[in-house]
C-alpha cells in the first residue's frame, strides 16, 4: 500500500534497496546495471526502480539530501514495504591526508552532529554502525575486483556549508575517512526497525586541500562503487543460503 512519500505497492520493492541521494542517479543505476527494470514510485520525482542483477531482484531509489529526507524514505521502505537491507551509495568529502580523490570509502560507523539518533535513543548517544556482514561482503567484493577501499568512521553532517572550517581538522585528527550527510540517519533507522544498512561512498572532493574531481572522474569511480555494492548483495545471499 502506498505511503505519503512512496506510491508503490507491497511486493514492488526487493528486500535489498540501493539508495543514492539523487533520483536521477537512481535512474542511471537502474538503466546501467539492472535488467527487466520497472519504475515503482515517483512521488516528488523521487524515482524508485526494481530490476534484476545477475538474476537477483534488487531495487534502487533516491533518498534526497540530508538525514531528515533519507530517514523518511528508509523508514517507509522498511516498515511499509518489507525492505531488509539498505545500501547507501553516494559521494563524500575527504579530510585525511591518506584519503585521495576517487577513493571508495566504506562507512563502518557514522559520527554526526545531528540529534536524530539521540531522539530515537532516549536522549543518549547511539553508536550508528553498519551491519558487519554487509561491511565484510563489500570488502570482499572490492578485493575480488581489485578495487582498493578505505574502511572506517565517516561523519554525517547537518550542514553542507559548515562555517566552522576548523572542525574539519578535528575530524582529520579523529580519523574520519569521509564526510557526507546521511549515513548516521540510515543506520539509526535500520537499528530502530530491525533492518541492516551500509554506506559506500566515492570521494568527490578533499575538503582541507581544496581538490575536486571532474564529472567524468566521478562517473568512473561511481561505477566501481556500484559494482562493489551489487556484488556484495550476491555475497550476502551466499552467506545466508
Swiss-Prot record:
List the GO terms this entry assigns under cellular component, sorted alphabetically. Answer: cytosol
InterPro entries, per this entry? DeoD-type (IPR004402), Nucleoside_phosphorylase_CS (IPR018016), Nucleoside_phosphorylase_d (IPR000845), Nucleoside_phosphorylase_sf (IPR035994)
Q: Which UniProt keywords apply?
A: Glycosyltransferase, Transferase
Q: Is Cytoplasm included in the keywords of this UniProt record?
A: no
Per the record's keyword annotation, is Transferase included, yes or no? Answer: yes
Record site feature (Important for catalytic activity), residues: 218
Catalytic site residues? Answer: 205 (proton donor)
**Catalytic reactions on record:** a purine D-ribonucleoside + phosphate = a purine nucleobase + alpha-D-ribose 1-phosphate; a purine 2'-deoxy-D-ribonucleoside + phosphate = a purine nucleobase + 2-deoxy-alpha-D-ribose 1-phosphate
Residues recorded as binding phosphate, renumbered to this chain, are: 21, 25, 44, 88-91
Molecular function per GO: purine-nucleoside phosphorylase activity
CDD domains per the record?
A: PNP_EcPNPI-like
BP-aspect Gene Ontology terms? purine nucleoside catabolic process
Residues noted as binding a purine D-ribonucleoside in the record, renumbered to the chain: 5, 180-182, 204-205
- The UniProt record lists the EC number as 2.4.2.1
Which residues does UniProt assign to the signal peptide? none
Tell me, how does this one assemble?
Answer: Homohexamer; trimer of homodimers.
What is the annotated role of this protein in its UniProt record?
A: Catalyzes the reversible phosphorolytic breakdown of the N-glycosidic bond in the beta-(deoxy)ribonucleoside molecules, with the formation of the corresponding free purine bases and pentose-1-phosphate.
**Family, as annotated:** Belongs to the PNP/UDP phosphorylase family.
Protein name per UniProt:
Purine nucleoside phosphorylase DeoD-type 1
Q: Which organism is it from?
A: Photobacterium profundum (strain SS9)
Identify the gene encoding this protein: deoD1
